[in-house]
Amino acid sequence: MTPRAARPATLALAAALAAGCGGAATEAGAPPSPAGAPGGSALQVPSPWLVADSLDPALVPAGFGTLRQEDVNVRLQYQSLLVRLLPLDESVIRTLSPDAYRTLRELLASRREEIEALSRRYALARARLWLVSFHGIEQGETRFSPLELTVRSGGRDFRPVDAVPLTPGFGEQRLGQRETQAALFVFDGALDVNQPMAITFQTVQSTAWDAILRRVERERSLIRSRAARTPH
């Protein structure tokens, strides 16, 4: 993990995301305007790496989700740290509201070079990316090891191979009260977020993803219904 100066736009974006702001859901029963359709703005993503990820025919269409980021975040508390984790797979983030989806795609596009460099360094045929934030909730300084994270899925343990810092000072591994640090964690592509997962940070484990996955699957069904009712 090599700290580097974060771009001003990325800092503002990371701060909002780390705080759990993922866009509000639309009113019940009212499908959102899809990205690129009237009432929405087209998402411009120049990265072939991102485009390839978004062309999987098994994915639900983009721009019809209503979930908020907090609906799909896994939260863990370890001592004086609050940890939030969000898998950034297309299959997950397409269930979010159009604004939240667009924001996360733009975040990934803004860090494309670092992500691709890490994929080459670790010989990853495909990288799985998670947005992970750490928030200090007690007085005084808290030291932590951000990569002490394990995701167990399909009988295998996955640990992040590296991280792309989104906030300055992430590599210093310490937090003050109410301070937040965030990064994109890079996992091996064999990690399947569409399966149950147990997530462990240090000594604290969460299986909350099982319930989140059921919520995501329900939203996918609703998205298909909304898309089918939308005039082409």
Where are these regions (language model features)?
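Bacterial N-terminal signal peptides that target proteins for export
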Residues: 1-10
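Hydrophobic helical h-region of N-terminal Sec-dependent signal peptides
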Residues: 11-15
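Conserved functional micro-motifs across diverse proteins
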Residues: 22-232
